[in-house]
Amino acid sequence: MQQAAVEQNAEAFVIGGYVRDLMLKRLNKDIDIVTSGDGPALANRTAELLNVKRVSIFANFGTAHFVYKGSEVEFVSARKESYRATSRKPDVEKGSLEDDQMRRDFTVNAMALSLQEDSFGELVDPFNGLLDLENKILRTPLEPAITYSDDPLRMMRAVRFASQLNFTIEEKSLHAIKENAARLEIVSVERTMVEFNKILLSKKPSVGMKLLFDTELLHQFFPEMVKLHGVEKRNNNAHK
């Protein structure tokens, strides 16, 4: 990958969840690569060098993907994103590494590791994600109200990570989730349920369920469950 980037006169970095889990010593087979050059072109050349036969190109998103030794490797060009109020699908334009880190959901997912020969393995962490990781804090790179309003699915992801990793959602961020809970309506039910299922499958689903209730996210996609709050069962009879 380093060789492919040099050939294209570009820089490449590992970014996101793989870096986070590497620091936490957790297994992660999803590897995200961001480049200052052309993401699909870097993917194609890297695949050639690794003798990978199949590369999936997603031209509309400017991304590419292949599987190597059981790991899913995705390539994307560094970019900026802007959102419209009615959609969580962003308008995209070319950007810098820091622009790309800024668009990430949480500081712990915005850390990057350099793949350049002269700085290989160097951590690029403009938002102090490593400190938040050590303190088990979920914080957004941008103002949380902007982060969650732009892409409301990130609110579900915040709860999921809190439940999976036993992290605490930073107070300002938690308040922004409560304020923006109704924005979840622009997210498809399918995407919301994927995150909900991951919360239920986490080690401490009770943590996630309490957060979903307290932030009123649960009210948006599962109001029937909210109505059960306060129901007691005595002698096989339910009481409200």
Where are these regions (language model features)?
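Catalytic cores of the polymerase beta-like nucleotidyltransferase superfamily
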Residues: 1-240
